[in-house]
Every structure is written in structure tokens, then in C-alpha cells.
Amino acid sequence: MLRYTRNALVLGSLVLLSGCDNGSSSSSSGNPDTPDNQDVVVRLPDVAVPGEAVTAVENQAVIHLVDIAGITSSSAADYSSKNLYLWNNETCDALSAPVADWNDVSTTPSGSDKYGPYWVIPLNKESGCINVIVRDGTDKLIDSDLRVAFGDFTDRTVSVIAGNSAVYDSRADAFRAAFGVALAEAHWVDKNTLLWPGGQDKPIVRLYYSHSSKVAADGEGKFTDRYLKLTPTTVSQQVSMRFPHLSSYAAFKLPDNANVDELLQGETVAIAAAEDGILISATQVQTAGVLDDAYAEAAEALSYGAQLADGGVTFRVWAPTAQQVDVVVYSADKKVIGSHPMTRDSASGAWSWQGGSDLKGAFYRYAMTVYHPQSRKVEQYEVTDPYAHSLSTNSEYSQVVDLNDSALKPDGWDNLTMPHAQKTKADLAKMTIHESHIRDLSAWDQTVPAELRGKYLALTAGDSNMVQHLKTLSASGVTHVELLPVFDLATVNEFSDKVADIQQPFSRLCEVNSAVKSSEFAGYCDSGSTVEEVLNQLKQSDSQDNPQVQALNTLVAQTDSYNWGYDPFHYTVPEGSYATDPEGTTRIKEFRTMIQAIKQDLGMNVIMDVVYNHTNAAGPTDRTSVLDKIVPWYYQRLNETTGSVESATCCSDSAPEHRMFAKLIADSLAVWTTDYKIDGFRFDLMGYHPKAQILSAWERIKALNPDIYFFGEGWDSNQSDRFEIASQINLKGTGIGTFSDRLRDSVRGGGPFDSGDALRQNQGIGSGAGVLPNELASLSDDQVRHLADLTRLGMAGNLADFVMIDKDGAAKKGSEIDYNGAPGGYAADPTEVVNYVSKHDNQTLWDMISYKASQEADLATRVRMQAVSLATVMLGQGIAFDQQGSELLRSKSFTRDSYDSGDWFNRVDYSLQDNNYNVGMPRISDDGSNYEVITRVKEMVATPGEAELKQMTAFYQELTELRKSSPLFTLGDGSAVMKRVDFRNTGSDQQAGLLVMTVDDGMKAGASLDSRLDGLVVAINAAPESRTLNEFAGETLQLSAIQQTAGENSLANGVQIAADGTVTLPAWSVAVLELPQGEAQGAGLPVSSK
């Protein structure tokens, strides 16, 4: 074990580099801290270094863009399309004229010279910072968002380079960097190998290194830092397998005497030059590969965070590139009570320090001294622990905590078990998942104690409308609650005095958000009204031309308590804003109390939505950047050329393909599984994870709970060049589930990215496609039949090998049914498919029906459309999934993406009075292009009221009761589905809108699964007129007892079964017809030969 201080590391680096020198075996009497005199010195081309074009004066900032192409071109460059996107936020608000719309490209250069354009930016103050994105049109020239902090650049005059996220103090610095070190296209992939296309066939290729500053040309244009000579080699098979997207790069070998351990603690730059030393190219080096190669094996064996054991506390953090790490301990009032240097383990790259048991409950942070390639500086800052299990308010400090402390457990916690088994495929197939958000559950429920609304403990309010409603759903067959993100999130302020929710006085909003005082709503600051009351006033005159509700709600969103939570800050701590006290351990016990209430009182298992595909932020300056401050450029997925953090997910993409982040994910899941008794995990954007990493994590967690279930969004992420992604098709046969977009789109109509008239044109099976067209509908009969095929396939669990008769009368496997160029069927078992027609993403089902339904469809018809759509999920094979409030006709007033639309647009009313329809135009930034369509359709039908909400709730319970009434609805096994499930009314002459699924339990199917039945029929009539089935002549079918009991309130009300077996289905109806079993198993409803 070696402990380095920063000074020791600097000294060590000089010894290292004088030893490894330039790779030459000859001795040298020259200065050991400079390259050998006999080697060619690399230098810049002979181009004059620029001064500033302009400098900022009072209340101004200046940004120069240094343009290398323009400098070296013989003709004048055109900068007319270059522009800045500028915005204020809570932490950076110095702009006097932010840009309101991303499509506004009017902030063009104030001027230019031969070195590039510049912008003079007006400020409202000379302190703080500004947010900047440099663009060409609306295309980013620099992938990362830039923050210019005036504390760092006191003259407020800076320079940037396209493709480089660094901000430079002067044009001279940026010029040298641009002509010197640009991009980050070299990859150090293992201890011996560097990959770099820029070095191919170049006479001189070197790896330069600096431990204390950036590698750059000096005042004479020369590169005088230490370096290693690199020699050409070939890409090994192992490297090619680990980094397939880099396998075509030129490969170089490092000298055998290179000290990797110390080289990684400073800046490394790959440089290629001509024989005479004139620089050809220079680039920063990405080091994630070598970090894994050098440290991961030893590091994976260790535990991290603050661990209580053996009468003390061990603090451990993995920070192999850090020059120094200290544990800084704080008292409850956040005063420093000690700073302790940590010891570095050279094998693992981990730093640790052992403290006493008196530190239990103490707050702490890590003080880092580490080189960060984004700033190209050795940074010093404090950062919270990524392995923290408890936090202070607003996640500013980590806290030492023992999760096994009995004081943090509700009574009976240790004996808590899951109410629904998850051991077998048949168990999993019974899952009916109710996706919920903590605030949506109780923020509006007046029967929940005021102090618990929007909190974990609202689920313990047993007499509340919300809890009673969930109990009713549970009794009818809903088995699981899925909680949208409940880990520590970055986008809700936990300091209550900084927050204003719409239930509070408008004056409070004005206090916490100064922008309101200068807005069109300033007059309400002294009104005495609540924000909600003002919104209710505004909605009366809200329109596409005057969308006041969304304008005010946008201001509310800046300081309210609402966010979906897909903004991970600390992965393994419950979110504090949902606790009655966000400080310290209260959140832990209250979270556990909620889990206990859901399992014991509601009788449901708990699934947790996890978001490991991105972090909220990255870089050395953002408050919510954690991992990237500790091991810079390791935990984030970087662009292979620029080194910028990718943002394909939404935010700062993470890199689960790197071993130590894969470990962090598995360690985090283990805590949620063992310490919080979570029964399943839903992975956000799972396609951004490697399949191997997801499978490895599952195996790790199954060792703790063999019955755990994994599923997620298996959309194609376009990361297949890097690794085999965890996508729908790739996960076939693994047992891991993925959401199916096939049934979703066929039933809802269109796709999730439709906008404008396309939202109305593209009807689905559930909204009248082919049977009740609206005025814009343009689907052909063939297209309607194809939608029906996709719906049938979805009801059969989207199995790749399921054989069905398609729209043309041909027998096809599921994998041969087209879905936008991809296989319609992709799964091996129905438990690998999660079917849905509504979840938190995109518009609610009610809003989509409102977009698409014909004006002829009255309110009663639309309620039944909702039920018919949900029936395809609830009565089909596969796992059933639904969004909270679908049973209440939930509307978000046409909002496509309500992640930050607050309590106003996300309201769920458990008093069953209001479904939140037509409460104002949705956010203009997302839905502005839909305003004209919304205006046309929103008044086509009356707003649902109590009668409609009660009716839909009854329909919903009918469907869930039917689902749990027979194991034939939940077969679980792919071979069983193919042996038992079939469809009638198929082919080219089918009756449009009519779906008829049979499930056999007769002798040909094998052993009887339901002793009551020889088979059943699911008949869905998604049409405005009755349909007649003649396929069951001679069969003694009878309506399900559940639907018979429901009588005139049933979705099957009016179904007629003639003596000869002919079945007549009324419009917009759902019927489950049972074939009773006699004294012995009968012939059943066998699958037809195809």
C-alpha cells in the first residue's frame, strides 16, 4: 500500500520520465526534464499568434471562435450561419437577452477577422456565469454545453474552438490549442497499446505528458514536455473485440518501461509530426480502456463508500487518476471537523481511510486533486460519494449510515416478503404493472394529510381516496406497482424555502423565482391567490394564440417540487424531496415504510425505475456532476473523435461498458434489492447498455433474490458499433423483458414522434382505424389489416416463432411480420414482452384517442375505445403494463412529454371528479407544432365527468379480474403459447376491427391448466357496429361469469350467443367466452393447422 501526496506524485513523475525518457537506449547528459537534444523538437507551423479581436467592456462578455479552417484558407470565410444559443438557469443567470427558442438562430457574430468570428454579449451583471452553445444553424459545433464563469475569466473575454469543450482565456491560448492539441481521437486501450488514426504512417509519433499543466506549445511554438516514443503495431484480437468501433484505427505500442500508474495522473497527448518536426496533428488521449486494463480486476474485488465494520468506518473511493484524495468530515451544521489524507492502493487505484465508530451519522465529502481533460487542468474540488447511502438536504454532503440499523427500519421490516410469487414463467406472466409517480399519487388528494401529500408516507394514509383506489385495483388483479425514479435526483430543490408549488400562494412563487416579477404575471404577486387559482383563471381564456397556462407553468416548473426524476444524482439513495425531512436518514426509513405499506396493505410487489444510462451532468464545474469529477472521462461515454460527452440519451451518457461503472450498477442494484426489498427493475433506455452487462448484473442480483425480474426499454440505441446492445431482438431467450412498441403503435395508431396532422391521420385499432375514420384518415384497407396483424401478434406475446395467418392469408412466423422494417415478433417467451398502450412517455391513451377519434365518436364511445384498447393488453399473453390513471381516463391535456410539466398537467383525481382534460395548451417547446390540431379536436366532445370515470374504473377492474380468472391468459412459456393460442377472423376477407383470440385447454394442448375450462375465446369488437362470429358453431360457449355478474355495466353487455354457437358482439365491446370442461378434458379449441 502506497500513499501519495500531490507533491510526491509530481516528484515521482519527474523520476519516471527521466527514466523512461524518450524511449532511446542511448545515454544523455542533457537536462533530464527535457527531451534529448538529438531528437527533433516538434513545433507549430509558422503562423502568427493572434491577439483579441475585441475585449469586453462594462456589462458585456465576449466569445471568440477560433477557426482553423478560416485561418489556413486563401479565401474569406462565411460566418453568417454561426450563432449562439444562450440561456439563463438557476445557477447561471447573467444574460440580459437569453435565446428563448432553440430554432432561433439570430444571435449571429458581432464581427469577425481572419482568425474567426466573435460575439459581444450583453449582461445584466458582471458576476456569476452564462450558458452557451456554439452552433452552425441549429447544429452544435461543440457537443458539450459551455458555461463561462466570470470568476474564472475575470475579463469576461474568452475563446473556444469547434469540437473542443474547453473554454480558453485568450485567443492566443485557443489558437495554440487548435494548432496544437485538438479533439481527443487517440485511445489508450490497454497498458501497451494506443489507437490513433491521426498517427498512421507519420514519421514521428509520440505520447507527450505533463503532470501539472496542459501539454502545449511554448512561446516559441515548441513542444518541450516529456514524451514517450510510440512504435507502430497491429490491433490485437482482444483489443478488437473490446473496442470494435476502433478496430480500424492505427495501433501504436508504448515502451515497455512506461509507468502507466503515474502517466495516468496527468495529461497525455498524442502528437504526430513530419520528419523535420513540424506538427501534423495533436490530440488528447481517452484512457477508459487502459484504466480497465490496469486496475479493474483488483478494483472489482473491493467494496466502496463509507462502510461500518469492526468498530470503525472505512471510506473507499475508486479514483485511479487522482493525485490526492482526502476525506473531509463535517458536523451536522456542516462545519469541517476533520480532513484526512487517504491512502492509494496502486493495484486497484482505490483510495481509502479508516476512521472510528464515532463517525456514524457524520457527513463527509471527498476532496479531490485530479487532472480533468475537459478543462485540461489539475482541478481541486470536493465531491460527494457516488456510493453514498444517505445524504444531506439537496445532496450537498454524503452521510455515514448503517442500513442495518434497526432505527432505520419500520416494525416488521426484516420479515417483509413479496405478496406475489415471481419464481416461474407462469408467475411472471401474471404480472399486471401499475406505473406510478410519487407526487402524482397524492399531491391532489385532499384525503391524504397535508404534510404527506407528494411524499412516500402518503401510501400509508389508509383511509385516503388514493390508497382505497389502489386497494381496489389490487383486489381486481393489479399485482405490481412500478415507481418512477425514486433515487436521488438532481432537478428538484430539497430546500423547501426555495420551492413554490401550485397549491401555495402566488406571492411565494414571486419570492423564489425572481423572473415572475418581471413577467406578464407579475400582477398576481400581491393578489392573495394561490398559483392553482391563477392557473384556473387563465385556462378560461387559454388558446393557441394566447397559451398563458403553459407560459405561467413554465415559470412554475423552474422552482416547483415536480420532475419525473430521470436525472440521476446519486444512484443508491432515496430521493429526499419525497421525505418529510430531506436531511439525513429520514428518507431511508420513510422509503422502507412506503415499500412495506405497498406490500402489506395494498398487496402489490414493487418495481423500481432505474436510470443508469446517463448522469444528470458531467465535467469539473457542474454541481450535480459526481462520477466525472472523481474519474474524469471514465464513467461517461465519449465521442470517439472529439472526447465530448455523448448526449444521445438526453443528458450526459454514461458508459456501462466500462467495468467499474458496470460494478457500480450491480452494487447499486444489490442495495435496492437487499436493503429496500425491491422486487423488479425497469431499466430506462436499456438499449444504451451492453447486453453482457445487463445479464451480468441480473446474475449478480439473482444470487441475492432468485425471483428478481428485469425489464426495460430495449429500443435500438445505435451503439451496436461499440457492443452488442441490450435491445428487444438481442435479448430473445434471456428471460429479460422489453417493452413492445408493436402493439402500442397498432392500437394507438401512428408512432411516438408524430406531430401536427399526423397525430390525427394515423388512427389505430383502438381509435377507429378502418371502421370510423376521421376527416384526415388515409389508411388503406391493407394497412388496417396490417395493424390488426401486429395487434394479434402482440396479444400472442410477440413471439418470433409464433405462426399466424397474416393480412393476405399467408402463414407467417412472428419474425416475418413487418414492423417498420424490423421483425414484428422477437421474443422466445411472452414474459420477455411487456405490452402497453399507455405509459408516462408520450400522450396518455385518452389524449391519443382525443387526437384520433372521429367527430362522430361521442363521449360514451370514446370511453369504450379506451377500454377496448386496454383489453388488448390485459387479455393478451405477455406482461401487462399500464400508466397510473388510465382507469380514470387520465388526460395531460395533450402534453407529449410531461416530465417537468408539474402538478397542473400531471394531475390525477382520486375523487373521480375530473380527468384533467383541456386545462390549457401544453408546453409550447414540445407541443407548439400540435396547437392547431389540439384546437380543432379539444371541443369535439364533452369533458369526462364522474360518471365516465366511474364507468371506466369498472371496465378496468373487469379486465383485470378477467386476466386473473384463468391461467390461460398468462401462459408464460413460448412453447405453450404456440401450442394453445390461435386467432380467428384473419386473412384478406376479415371483418375490420374484430379481434378473436382462442386459447386451447383441450386434449391436444396437453395437460389441463384450468380445471374449469377446455378453452376460452377473447373477442374484441373495435368497431361502431355489431359483429357476428360464425366460427364457433356447435360449441357450447358461455360468457364469463365475471362479465355475467357485471351485467349491464360490463364491456360485454349485449353480447348474444345463439344456440348454434353464433356470437354477436355489440359495438366497442369485449367479451371473454368460456368453453366449460366436463367431467374430463375435452376436445377444446385446438390451434388450426397452418
Swiss-Prot record:
GO molecular function terms attached to this record: carbohydrate binding; pullulanase activity
Subcellular location: Cell membrane
Signal sequence, renumbered to the chain: 1-19
Positions annotated as active site in the UniProt record: D684 (nucleophile), E713 (proton donor)
Residue positions of covalent lipid attachment, annotated as S-diacylglycerol cysteine: C20
EC number(s) reported in the record: 3.2.1.41
Entry keyword annotation includes Hydrolase: yes
Record-annotated site: Transition state stabilizer: D841
GO BP terms: carbohydrate metabolic process
Disulfide bonds: none
Gene Ontology cellular-component terms listed: plasma membrane
Chemical reaction(s) catalysed: Hydrolysis of (1->6)-alpha-D-glucosidic linkages in pullulan, amylopectin and glycogen, and in the alpha- and beta-limit dextrins of amylopectin and glycogen
Highest taxon, organism lineage: Bacteria
Membrane topology summary: Lipid-anchor
N-palmitoyl cysteine lipid attachment residues: C20
Pfam families attached to this UniProt entry: CBM_48, PUD, Pullul_strch_C, Pullulanase_Ins, Pullulanase_N2
Keywords associated with the record: Cell membrane, Glycosidase, Hydrolase, Lipoprotein, Membrane, Palmitate, Signal
Family membership noted in the UniProt record: Belongs to the glycosyl hydrolase 13 family.
Summary of subunit composition and partner proteins: Homotrimer.
Protein name: Pullulanase
Species, as recorded: Klebsiella pneumoniae
Encoding gene per record: pulA
